[in-house]
Amino acid sequence: MPQAALDKYAGWEPRYCREHSPQRARALDKPNTPAQSVAKSRGSVGRGRSLREANLTTNEVLDKFTDGPETGVFTDGGSAPNPGPGGWGVVWVKDGEIQAERYGHDPDTTNNRMELMALTEAFKILPEDAEVEVFSDSRLCVQTITEWAPGWERRGWKKKSGPIKNLELVQQLLRLYRAHPRCTLKWTAAHSGTRWNEYADSLSTAWMRDKK
């Protein structure tokens, strides 16, 4: 603390700065918790780690992770930076066996567009009579399709707060979602160790490894 500040506020005793707060100290004391995880970045790409830090191959994912459902369609997408180049990935598994997987890349995109693209491709690979859970780690995208989009549609694809972002993707995804009435769209936490969500994340970052 500068002496000038202490002279200006006589009698005041400094407690601690944000850098040395008890909350930060507790976080740093946790085993295997890197300092950078204290302040997590927003968006599906970097919940707790950046896209580049999470850039595992699919084989590395299978070796490292074992938790989570063994049946379902898992999706992920993101860009680095946001906006910027990005990718999406989808894997459909049944009893731990891969039924299908897809991934793609866009040189100029956003996190949300890639998340929507991943979900769109997920429903494209499923037959219309499929009965399976489809997972996304984007709560925004899940709520958009399951809660908000039907209301926007009734109002002529308008919402009170302004234009609907990524409207063409939202409309396409809503049509595909409705064409699969026995499928359930669910949110799952990002980078929580769920094996097949991590696998979808790896597919979504394949474009980065392909550049090397």
Task: Explain the meaning of each model-derived region.
Residues 40-63:
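Charged, flexible boundary elements
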Residues 97-114:
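A short, polar/acidic, helix/strand-boundary loop motif
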Residues 1-5, 21-24:
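Cys/His-rich microdomains that often coordinate metals
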Residues 88-92:
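Short beta-strand scaffold segments in enzyme catalytic cores
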Residues 71-72, 78-82, 97, 101, ...:
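RNase H catalytic domain
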Residues 2-16:
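Short linker/helix segments within small regulatory modules
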Residues 12-36:
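Short metal-binding segments enriched for Cys and/or His
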